Structure formats: C-alpha cells, structure tokens
C-alpha cells in the first residue's frame, strides 16, 4: 500500500483532483469506530471528513485523550477539548496559537486556549525551554536554531483511551490540520486494540510533557 502511495504522489507532482480521488480510493475513511488492527489514511483528500473523523474519535474517548499539536490547535479540536466526554484530556502544543502577528486576533486566540486550559478536565503543556541554572537538577537550555517554525513539538499523534483494553493510536506525518488533510502529501496510521503500541506512545507523550511542563521547583525524577 505504501509503495502504491509513493508511486501515486511521485515526481512530478500529479494534478490535485486525480491524486485526491486515487488516495481516497486507496485508503477509504472508516465509518464510525475504526476496525481492529491498522488502517492507513493518506492525504491530500477531497474534504475535511478525515479531520472531522479524528475529532469524533477524540470527542468520544471515554477515559482519557492525549494529543499533540505542532501548529496551534484547530477549531474542531478546540471544540473537542471544550466538550469531550473523557474526564482526563491532555494536549501538548508547540505554541498557544498558529504563527501570527501580535494583535487582536492573536490575543483572542490565546484567550481561547487559556479558557480551555482553565477547564479542570484539561491539562495543556506548551513548548518552552528552561531559562535558569538555579533550580537543582535542571540545566539552562537554549534553542539550536535548526528550525524557525517548529522549536519544541513536531510529533503528530492522538491517543484515545490508551490505558484501556481497546486503545486507539493515530500517528503519522500529518498535523491535525486542514492543510495536512486537503493539501499536503501525508500518511497516517490508525491502530486500534494494540496495547503495546499505546503504551509506547503514552510513555513518549509523558516524557515530552515532563520536559516542557514540569514543575521546575522540584528535582526531576527518572
């Protein structure tokens, strides 16, 4: 399947409409809950149905939800974190907003994220680096300057009920965004029922959350 995908999106870039038709035929979107095992979903697609489907899965998590966002949180997931069923909802963000100039629009977006952070069900970690050597166990950090747009978080995965017996892991190259759904060449895997995979991704999520969100008044524990 991935060979077919690679051939379909190969050089030179194929026209958009035939490409989207081919990828939706190759990787049709499941209806409702994904089947057990692994399902591939390739982009670009003709509509935002895949993004909305991811949001529905997140919204219907029963115990816990964990997501990463590299370029701000899209509106559809703001609604998820405002109204989802799960009593425990974590989000790991590169930054509070999409890249935008300072102004009223950015302030409104930051306020919206802060409102979500204030909800007792939500725990958000937003990328930053340690700025002091004065806390025992931590060393002052600086950025490498390798990438001006993504400095801390560039993982793309969602964990739905990862601590249960029937977890769902969604991972791959696509950000949970409109661009990665309808414009970019991306590939995602939806893995249902594999508790080992869910454990690994949950461990990675909490490792990154520790780095960007830890209480620096305490010595880090391993």
Question: Where are the predicted features?
Answer:
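PLD-like (HKD) phosphodiesterase/transphosphatidyltransferase domain
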Residues: 18-97, 157, 202
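Prokaryotic Sec-type signal peptides and long signal-anchor helices
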Residues: 6-9, 46, 209
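PLD/PLD-like phosphodiesterase catalytic module centered on the HKD motif
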Residues: 75-222
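Surface-exposed intrinsically disordered loops and tails
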Residues: 7-39, 116-147
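Extended, H/D-rich, highly charged conserved domains that either
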Residues: 1-4
